[in-house]
Design a protein with these regions (language model features):
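Short S/T/G/P-rich N-terminal loop/turn motif that feeds into the first structured element of a domain
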Residues: 1-52, 83-87, 112-192, 221, ...
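Short, glycine- and small/hydrophobic-rich beta-strand elements in well-ordered beta-sheets
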Residues: 5, 47-74, 101-116, 192-215, ...
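Short, well-ordered beta-strand segments in beta-rich or mixed alpha/beta enzyme
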Residues: 19, 69-84, 170-175, 210-233
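A short acidic (Asp/Glu
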Residues: 76, 89-91, 120
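Secondary-structure boundary elements
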Residues: 84-87, 98-101, 195
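Short amphipathic alpha-helices in soluble, non-transmembrane regions
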Residues: 90-97, 228-234
Length: 268
């Protein structure tokens, strides 16, 4: 039997964009009340449409959500799930046409795609292809792997193209897998990586798309859950030995119907 590939198959779904903004409160407060009201109404209508997403019964959710950031790293976070990069770019351009946009200063962004790593399935698929006498890397091998992943793709559509959870709080952070001299995630056998990945969350992949390898979005109605979850992750091998974490961004959901409360400083 030929040596099986150590690269697991992956499935990709929604393209995801995080936009982090500072808000120019000084300029905003100088506006007359009627102008602020009009700008707020315009943005609320846009956000409501984005929140609703795709209303077609067989379409992907393709939703957006707004969050009020806690701390000095920014004021607002917009997250968008869309089918393509072009759709994400249209969202950016649509926001830029609003009367609110001059008051927004984008300080950061993060681009990724929902990714499911098929660690366990990959081993089975590779073994089945090898039993058929196929050689890794050949057109026949690639076609067989493609057919197998296509079947899995259909069964995992709701995870690949998720709706944004209705939870009140969001914790977002990027992360890498270490490649140092002492530990290197990518040199571990695929079977070992599969075992360790059973302890991880479903994350978005950003290799070749942004500065980190993955982005993680956690949603909860109790922010202490984030602390407990990340604390527990420090004890699983994937995170404790192989993970390198970026900045953490914690924020509170702002629905379109409540956007006036945010502008007025009365968000509950």
């Amino acid at each position: 039997m030929p040596e099986l590939p150590q690269v697991p198959l992956t499935l990709e779904g929604s393209n995801v964009l995080h936009q982090i903004f500072r808000f120019d409160w000084t300029a905003w407060k100088k506006l007359p009340l009627d102008e602020r009201t009009a700008i707020s109404a315009e943005f609320s209508a846009l956000l409501a449409r984005w929140e609703a997403g795709n209303t077609e019964p067989n379409g992907h959710p393709n939703q957006s959500a707004l969050f009020s950031q806690i701390g000095h790293k920014g004021d607002l976070i917009l997250i968008h799930f869309r089918d393509s990069l072009e759709d994400l770019n249209r969202v950016e351009l649509e926001l830029a046409q609003t009367s609110l946009y001059p008051f927004l200063q984008q300080t950061s962004s993060y681009l990724s795609v929902v990714e499911l790593g098929l660690y366990e399935s990959s081993e089975k698929i590779y073994a089945q292809l090898a039993e058929k006498g196929l050689e890794p890397g050949t057109p026949e091998w690639n076609a067989g792997a493609g057919e197998a992943t296509a079947r899995t793709f259909a069964s995992l559509s709701s995870r690949l193209f998720p709706a944004i959870p209705p939870a009140k709080y969001l914790c977002f952070y990027p992360m890498d897998r270490k490649r140092g001299e002492q530990v290197n995630w990518y040199t571990e056998p695929m079977a070992d990586r599969r075992t360790m990945m059973h302890e991880r969350q479903i994350i978005t992949g950003s290799i070749g798309l942004d500065d980190w390898e993955w982005g993680v979005d956690l949603f909860a109605d109790d922010p202490i859950i984030f602390k407990k979850l990340i604390y527990e992750m420090r004890f699983d091998k994937v995170s404790a030995v192989y993970a390198s974490f970026g900045q953490f961004f914690l924020s509170v959901r702002v629905h379109a119907a409540n956007i006036n409360q945010w502008f007025d400083g009365t968000l509950a």
